């Protein structure tokens, strides 16, 4: 018989840096999950990522206080800023451009995000990532 799901918790945690402090501790504590067990498992699973990279995670909590979790790919905005070599996007993206990014880099990011995105094909996903880049004040070049 399958376990009864008590709830889902969605967080963004830095790779290899999960610890009991906020936001992880309070979110897991209110569901009665063993916080240190999650932190150790998450840090072990995210070793392959660059330290400090934000990793979205969906934690499924069961009625017996056990849990499973699924890590997603890093946010497109983080990957775009990293590819462009910037710290942050533009506060006024329509008037103030902060950098440029090659279309090939956008295509690479779309391929990385393909597992998490619901899109018809890679071209549609690439256009979606290009839109994200433009909304951050980045100019997409060929």
UniProtKB/Swiss-Prot annotation:
Ordered alphabetically, the record's keywords are:
Methylation, Ribonucleoprotein, Ribosomal protein, RNA-binding, rRNA-binding
Q: Does the keyword Cytoplasm apply?
A: no
Cite a single GO BP annotation: translation
Cellular component GO terms, alphabetically?
cytosolic large ribosomal subunit
What about PTM? One or more lysine residues are methylated.
InterPro entries associated with the record: Ribosomal_uL11, Ribosomal_uL11_bac-typ, Ribosomal_uL11_C, Ribosomal_uL11_C_sf, Ribosomal_uL11_CS, Ribosomal_uL11_N, Ribosomal_uL11_N_sf
Q: By its UniProt entry, which SMART domains does this protein fall under?
A: RL11
**GO terms assigned for molecular function:** large ribosomal subunit rRNA binding; structural constituent of ribosome
**Family as reported in the entry's similarity comment:** Belongs to the universal ribosomal protein uL11 family.
Q: How does it assemble?
A: Part of the ribosomal stalk of the 50S ribosomal subunit. Interacts with L10 and the large rRNA to form the base of the stalk. L10 forms an elongated spine to which L12 dimers bind in a sequential fashion forming a multimeric L10(L12)X complex.
Tell me, in a sentence or two, what this protein's role is: Forms part of the ribosomal stalk which helps the ribosome interact with GTP-bound translation factors.
Put simply, this protein is called Large ribosomal subunit protein uL11
